Amino acid sequence: MSFLSKLRDRLTKSSSRISAGLDEVIGDAPAPAAPPQAAPAPAPQTPGVPHPPTPAVPRPAPDRPGLVDRLLGRETAPAEPRRELDDAMLEDLEDMLIAADMGTDTALRVTANIAEGRMGRRIGATELKQALADEVTRIMTPVARPLPLYPKKPQVVLVVGVNGSGKTTTIGKLASQFRAAGKKVVIAAGDTFRAAAVEQLQVWGQRAGVPVMVAAHGSDPASLAFDAMTRAEAEGADLLMIDTAGRLQNRADLMEELAKIVRVIRKKDPTAPHNTLLVLDATTGQNALSQVETFRKLADVSGLVMTKLDGTARGGVLVALADKFGLPIHAIGVGEQIDDLDAFDAGEFARALVGL
């Protein structure tokens, strides 16, 4: 199954919520009032002149499909419900987009753009979905950029994110994909206080044939990063991917830990890290925006990866992230398998999101 097919199939919670919401927005329209029928004026009465009998008006035949359509088993499709795009409908649309975690500011901008040139017109759900998909594509296209690869070796990729965001799995999947593309990769298991994270990376490394450097439990992550840089340089690795801690309970300690990792690896390469990826969990909804703000203060975030889009009805948060921060979205994840993480495509995502 292609990634696009998986995206359409597994983004059902978000697309069903938004698609059903758009149908409801159209369906909420009051039925148009029929214009009042003027009563016919009575015919003048002429004394002594008999009136001819009123001819019977034949009852109109019910609409039926043509002979060819009936022979082929085709029925006439019912007309799609339509609603006049007015202020009340725009308010319903805004409420629906906010409920889908698109955020208030983004929802207001999107609805304003949809209204342009359409106010006062009667539109159906299909046109509304296409208009929304076009707006989402317009917002997302500038940020849909794959992880850049540089001739510099090793290219150091620092990966940050809160615990449970899918950070460790994302590193394993990216490393496996780069390895399959012919790149030589080294992984550093820098979250030295979480044995489970280290073990998970080792499993991914074994699957992909990628070496994973580990250190004793609770040891200095910066020291491990330095050793990993040394090994990556010696082996001519194309990429060094460094996992980091994701404990936000004590931000001061985490900030110092990340800053120390950067200081140490810059002793080996003053331009490192070349990428700092923030991995976000789509199921957190609007909390993802606060995570971006936090990690931009802790580290120089250069791009985003969004995971778990298959397990949430909050896919709209990705639109809010793009609209607010403009950070590149390198990849999205829709499952646990290695090929369930792929480069982000704005148009495919937009159409899957609205159910087209």
Task: Report the location of each language-model feature.
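Non-catalytic terminal/linker segments enriched in charged/polar, low-complexity residues
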Residues: 1-139, 145, 152-153, 180, ...
